[in-house]
């Protein structure tokens, strides 16, 4: 299948759902995914050599994912599925570049669905670079995929249900959880889920997580946050405190917990590197993770024929990602003439209805758990913000004080975002720092320009790319 009609980047819930709908309609589909197996972060399958003895250990989402993966298997022979294939660039004239097995390849695209997912929000605070501080998502990968505990005495700090999920998996794996700090009001989102109990089974799952945690004797502290981590060569203790409605510490409530691991779960940031590179218009939505591509009801972006689905287009969870993927797959089939507009409307209707119901729930959850200003005020002047270039908050504030109040200008002046992570670990925080220092809404602070490659690739891969490429203006 040299020239597929549709290319899908990402084989998580959104990408797989899109592939299923498009292939069923007759569209020739190629999927490029950087992981060894389909499923993405939520529905990811165990690595070779591991056997799942207790399916319940991976949680209800894993079981839901098996249904989607079974659908995928039924149309697998109709799809050109490439695993371990990393897309790292797009160019003018609708050309993309990816590498697989150490070889660079170029590929023209007509219709494109981007299902690139999201990554854990980085939260700088004193001590966050110590060994033993990791994200809840990273801890979940260790526990789910390798059956390895992230530490011996673990503190969870964040907001929202994800850290409850991971804490349950740690407990099930024999780990010790010192405490769970919920920055928001956990009773609020449990009551909220009760109001939506007819949909998605979220109430049952959430209550079961809380029951397990309380049965294990783990303190579940609402309106609490991590302030600092201390230790010589690794985490040895954490400073925590109660916080107000803006997540600012109530100083008199400070106390110290003896722990060796801190797992942070303050939400996700959409991976928009490829949507930016393609040239899609973006808008800022704090409740959906930050900058996201603007889309219409068909999930199509401002670039004709380019669609975006899942957490990479706004963090809303795996259930929403599947719905968006199905709609994008059907819309693609319609645009290519495989189904009529009437048939497309018929197929999309139940998914659109479910999206509206799910959207109301997500909006309400986001109002409770999205980051408040105090989260971005934890760092001190000597706290490293850009880990790659070892830039501190003081360095960034100094540059801002000299009039450098734009992200790209700050990058040129300080080298912020020029390291291996390409800004993923620092740019979201720097945007909030600029907003706070200049009293400017984050939505008005333009994000970093995107350039290829979007992820690190070996030089030999670039050397092996055939032909020449035209770089889009504005980089």
Language-model features: locations:
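Residues forming the flavin
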Residues: 1-420, 424-475
């Amino acid at each position: 299948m040299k020239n597929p009609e549709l290319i899908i980047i990402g084989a998580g819930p959104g990408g797989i759902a899109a592939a299923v709908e498009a292939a069923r309609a007759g569209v020739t589909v190629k999927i490029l995914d950087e992981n060894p197996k389909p499923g993405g972060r939520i529905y990811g399958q165990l690595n070779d050599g591991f056997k799942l003895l207790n399916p319940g250990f991976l949680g209800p989402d894993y079981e839901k994912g098996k249904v989607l993966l079974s659908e995928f298997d039924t149309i697998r022979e109709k799809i050109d599925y490439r695993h371990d294939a990393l897309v790292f660039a797009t160019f003018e004239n609708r050309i993309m570049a990816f590498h697989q097995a150490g070889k660079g390849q170029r590929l023209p695209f007509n219709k494109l669905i981007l299902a690139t997912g999201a990554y854990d929000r980085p939260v700088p605070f004193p001590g966050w670079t110590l060994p033993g501080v990791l994200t809840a998502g990273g801890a979940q990968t260790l526990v789910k995929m390798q059956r390895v505990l992230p530490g011996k005495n673990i503190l969870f700090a964040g907001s929202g249900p994800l850290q409850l999920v991971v804490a349950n998996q740690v407990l099930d794996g024999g780990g010790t959880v010192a405490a769970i700090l919920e920055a928001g009001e956990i009773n609020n989102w449990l009551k909220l889920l009760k109001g939506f109990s007819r949909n998605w089974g979220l109430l049952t799952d959430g209550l079961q997580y809380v029951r397990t945690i309380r049965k294990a004797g783990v303190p579940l502290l609402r309106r609490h946050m991590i302030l600092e981590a201390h230790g010589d060569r690794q985490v040895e203790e954490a400073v925590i405190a109660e916080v107000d409605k803006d997540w600012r510490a109530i100083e008199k409530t400070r106390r110290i917990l003896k722990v060796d691991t801190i797992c942070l779960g303050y939400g996700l940031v959409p991976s928009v590197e490829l949507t930016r590179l393609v040239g899609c218009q973006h808008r800022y939505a704090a409740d959906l993770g930050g900058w996201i591509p603007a889309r219409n009801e068909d999930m199509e972006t401002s670039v004709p024929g380019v669609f975006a689905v899942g957490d990479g287009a706004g963090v809303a969870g795996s259930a929403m990602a599947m719905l968006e993927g199905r709609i994008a797959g059907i819309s693609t089939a319609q645009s290519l003439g495989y189904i009529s507009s009437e048939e497309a409307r018929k197929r999309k209707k139940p998914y659109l209805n479910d999206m509206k119901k799910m959207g109301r729930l997500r909006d309400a959850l986001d109002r409770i758990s999205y980051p408040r200003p105090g989260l971005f005020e934890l760092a001190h002047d000597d706290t490293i913000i850009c880990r790659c270039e070892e830039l501190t908050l003081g360095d960034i504030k100094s540059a801002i004080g000299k009039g450098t109040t734009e992200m790209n200008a700050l990058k040129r002046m300080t080298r912020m975002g020029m390291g291996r992570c390409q800004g993923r670990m620092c740019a979201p925080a720097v945007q909030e720092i600029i907003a706070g220092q200049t009293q400017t809404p984050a939505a008005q602070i333009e994000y970093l320009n995107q350039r290829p490659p979007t992820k690190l690739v070996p030089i030999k891969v670039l050397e092996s790319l055939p032909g020449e490429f035209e770089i889009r203006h504005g980089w």
